[in-house]
Every structure is written in structure tokens, then in C-alpha cells.
Amino acid sequence: GAVVNAGNDKGAPGQALADLALLAARHGDWESLRISWLGGAQCGLACDLITAAIYAPFELFMALPEWGEPDHSLLDMALRAGAKIFLSRDPELVLENAHAVYMGHGPEQCAAAPLTSGWPLTDELLALAAEDAAVLSWHGLAPADRASDTALRRAAAFWPERLAARRLMEARLYAL
């Protein structure tokens, strides 16, 4: 049978594929789909989204603290391949008109990070995204100090649909 990486500390390509399929179906158009990432992006789902941006024409906007930048060789490869990836230290710029907002990991998951680094997903930041923007997080729900109650409620509301999409994607991949 096929070997499928359904997710671990290094990545979650199955989740990335499922999320992208769900978000594209929800939005209806790859070309204008804007995905935002807020927080650390050294590994995991963030790197899978960077890789996916090589093959799918969505826009990936990432607000990254200094300690949370993705692998530079992966980023360089993606940009050379034509991926539409935009990096910033300004979360307001990154979240503006986003159709999906990922809450990346915080400094507690990065040994080199100062404890004060990173941005929580506040109501003020979330208000910059599209009104119906999906809120997603790296491992289930983010700790309450990383997101407002509104953001956590939106992430929780989207979680069942996201989990179902992942199970469907994994079933399709296992059937190969």
C-alpha cells in the first residue's frame, strides 16, 4: 500500500492538501484565494503551505517574528518557481482581506525564541480579514493567550469541516 505522511512534527502535507481543497471549494477561486499565516513558520504546516504555493495559484501572506522564519532554501525554491508568497513583520498587512487565517505556533514551541515574541490573533487583527474568513490553527486550537475568544470560536466552528476534509483526503491518498 501507499505510504502517506498524515502529519508529524516535521510536517502535515495531508492536512495542508485537505485545507487547501476545502478553502478553494469554499472560496470558489484559486487565483484570488488569500491565505494568511500569523506566527512561527520554521516547520510543519507552514512549510507544507509554502510547498503547495508552488503548485496552486493562491496567495500566501506570512507575518513572521524574527525567530520564526521558514527554511530559507525552501522559501527560495518556492519563490523561484513562481509561488505567490509575501513575508512581513506586520500582522495587520498580512491579515488584510484574508480568506483564511492560520495561527502559527508561538515562541513556546521554539527554544531560541524570547518569551515575548509572536503575535496573538486579537479581535482587532481578525477584523482585518474577510468577514467569513476561516480561522485555522497548527495543532487543534491555540492556547487562549495566543488568540481571542472570537478567533477560538471561529477555529472551533471550522474544525469539524476541516477534520472531515482531512479524513477524505487521507482516504483518497491511501486508495492510490
Regions found by a protein language model. Name each.
Residues A25-M103:
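Glycine-rich phosphate/diphosphate-binding loop of Rossmann-like nucleotide-binding domains
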Residues A12-A18, D71-S73, R167-R172:
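Short, charged, surface-exposed secondary-structure boundary motifs
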Residues A18-L23, H99-G106, R172-L176:
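Short, surface-exposed amphipathic charged segments that create phosphate/polyanion-binding patches used
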Residues L79-R167:
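Rossmann-like adenosine-cofactor binding region
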Residues G1-A24, A142-A144:
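Phosphate/diphosphate ligand-binding glycine-rich loop within oxidoreductases
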Residues G7-G11, P65-W67, E161-A165:
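Short, acidic/turn-prone active-site loops that include or flank metal/cofactor-
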Residues K10-P13, C43, W67-E69, Q109, ...:
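Short, small-residue-enriched loops and turns at beta-alpha junctions
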